[in-house]
Amino acid sequence: MMSNLIILPMLLPFVCALILVFTKNKNRISKILSITTMIVNTMISIALLIYVVNHKPITLDFGGWKAPFGIQFLGDSLSLLMVSVSSFVVTLIMAYGFGRGEKRVNRFHLPTFILLLTVGVIGSFLTSDLFNLYVMFEIMLLASFVLVTLGQSVEQLRAAIVYVVLNILGSWLLLLGIGMLYKTVGTLNFSHLAMRLNHMENNQTITMISLVFLVAFSSKAALVIFMWLPKAYAVLNTELAALFAALMTKVGAYALIRFFTLLFDHHPSVTHTLLVFMACITMIIGAFGVIAYKDIKKIAAYQVILSIGFIILGLGSHTISGVNGAIFYLANDIIVKTLLFFVIGSLVYMSGYRNYQYLSGLAKREPFFGVAFVVVIFAIGGVPPFSGFPGKVLIFQGAITNGNYIGLALMIVTSLIAMYSLFRVMFIMYFGDADGEQVQFRPLPIYRKGLLSVLVVVVLAMGIAAPVVLKVTEDATNLNMKEDVFQKNVNTHLKEVNHK
């Protein structure tokens, strides 16, 4: 029974998206249906996650064809944690955008494409074979291509061209890697791949193939290959920028974690050393970006890049603590970046400016923003007891265990830079003088303050209740880093491991 439910987190948004196609210009129906769907989706995802943590992973084989021959979905602690958090933030993002009451909310079927993007994201988390991962990536990317060009301004179209070109190249690389891996190993199912690759250690061909996947997923995660992200995020409206920041790069980071723990861990001196190097470069790029701009939307965009560096540094340590920290920080960052973009978007809404020098006096008029901003800053910086702290401590431990003191030092320094870049915005909000004309701030709608409050509470709760979340991330880490544990819990019928 539970195995059949695993399809629901992907099926419900898909069905809702189809229904919304026929509700054009019916604004109220669109809002109620889409938000209700995502609330139900979140509840189902959390229920499945609780079941998996207390029992064992669940799988669903379509058409009665068991793995490795049929299409399979896998619900383990890692995938369902990502699905639960993603469903939650999409619910808030939809409420944030659709609460405006504009008649334009259904223009271009905006909610439909948000739901289709969600289908691709959740499908990427749940699928248990490589080809379907590619299919889900394409669903996600096609929906995102539409969303990033909705405004039809010259600035948006320029950003969209870079975004589309780099992501198409990444998709080609992913398809190339899938073909190479299938030709070499003869299977695409994760469980079967893990079994066969475990018997192909020190195989240079596999190492080369793993590097193809590394580059492909790096283009999705903005790991070093980041050029598409700042321009694309800066031209999007608040809810779409929050959606992209919360989900798009995180799917790439999730894929890197899944592949370089469960599948490609046979030659860490090459693959994981390269991951650490790329993480360090990404942290440096992000740090320069957050202090180079006065545009608060671009500052937020580079914060996304910086956090990817933190996550991949933990993965690159190739240790239990490092990977555990990476998974925790990944889940946490989905929520924190949603809050960050909500705060930044609200500042732009109230002031009409993206340059933080025009925000003088805002915090005195809206004291609530001071609280929200402090929570964001400390969560990003990893200050205890905020939600960024447990993940960063575990990543620190992984770096120390691995002897990666340069990466550790970079993470500490760039974390401080990330905090500084936001503190200077906050300083202007409290104490700065308006640059030029006196800005007239318009009030933020109550419902948006309510959504910000929900995220603030959740970020605080993740820090205070970290042991609960760590139970989930520890289970995910052990399952994916220990091949024998994975095989005892997933697809136990796969006993034939000889490569034929």
Swiss-Prot record:
Similarity field: Belongs to the CPA3 antiporters (TC 2.A.63) subunit D family.
Subunit structure: May form a heterooligomeric complex that consists of seven subunits: mnhA2, mnhB2, mnhC2, mnhD2, mnhE2, mnhF2 and mnhG2.
Location(s), subcellular: Cell membrane
Domain of life: Bacteria
Key words of the record: Antiport, Cell membrane, Ion transport, Membrane, Transmembrane, Transmembrane helix, Transport
GO MF annotations, alphabetized: antiporter activity; NADH dehydrogenase (ubiquinone) activity
Keyword Transmembrane helix: yes
Membrane disposition: Multi-pass membrane protein
Protein name listed in UniProt: Putative antiporter subunit mnhD2
One Pfam family in the UniProt entry: Proton_antipo_M
Bilayer-crossing regions: 2-22, 32-52, 78-98, 108-128, 130-150, 161-181, 209-229, 240-260, 273-293, 308-328, 330-350, 368-388, 403-423, 450-470
GO BP annotation list: ATP synthesis coupled electron transport
GO cellular component terms attached to this protein's record: plasma membrane
